[in-house]
Amino acid sequence: MQKINDLKILFFDVGGILLSNGWGHESRKKAAVKFGLDYAEVDVLHNFIFNVYEIGSITLDEYLDTVIFNYPRDFVRQDFKDFMYSESVELPDMLQWLKEWKKDCGFRIISINNEGKELNDYRVQKFKLHKAFDAFISSCEVKMRKPDPGIFKLA
């Protein structure tokens, strides 16, 4: 039997722990107000297709075609994407603490997260998540989402 002292890997989520959720309901509500969208309709369409986006089966543009740009709009796609990205913010204290702690902790730290590729890539680059994690197991790359047991078996 393995002793707890032998464990050398820690798994972290990103959304809601270190950063805001990538594209949570609060952000979608803000988008509805900012861009004059019907939130109830956006929410139904989002729930219909977002899992497919998170496992990397469609791109962000394809997600947006289904959920936002299924009608002519008086705003452009890039403005909407910029808004989506701007909703990713660092939560107080945790990320900086993890980056510092990781330097001498002796553990491998691995991120397991449900993120679409474009949002995942943006967040890794913008918040320099490579300084906090040794590896990423992202739903968009492994074609499975938490809580699918398969994603944890990969870890």
Predicted regions and their residues:
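Generic structural signal for small/hydrophobic residues in well-ordered secondary structure
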Residues: 13-16, 56, 101, 111, ...
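Alpha-helical elements of Rossmann-like donor-binding domains used by nucleotide-donor carbohydrate transfer enzymes
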Residues: 26-30, 48, 62, 66, ...
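A metal-dependent, Asp-based hydrolase signature
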Residues: 51-81
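Short, solvent-exposed loop/turn segments at secondary-structure junctions
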Residues: 17-18, 24-25, 115-118, 142-143
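Short, conserved loop/helix-junction motifs that constitute active-site signature segments
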Residues: 4, 102-104, 128-132
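Substrate-recognition "cap/lid" segment bordering the active-site pocket of phosphatases
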Residues: 117-155
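Active-site neighborhood of HAD-like aspartate-dependent phosphohydrolases
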Residues: 2-45
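Short, acidic loop-to-helix structural element flanking the phosphoryl-transfer center
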Residues: 6-9, 69, 78-110, 121, ...
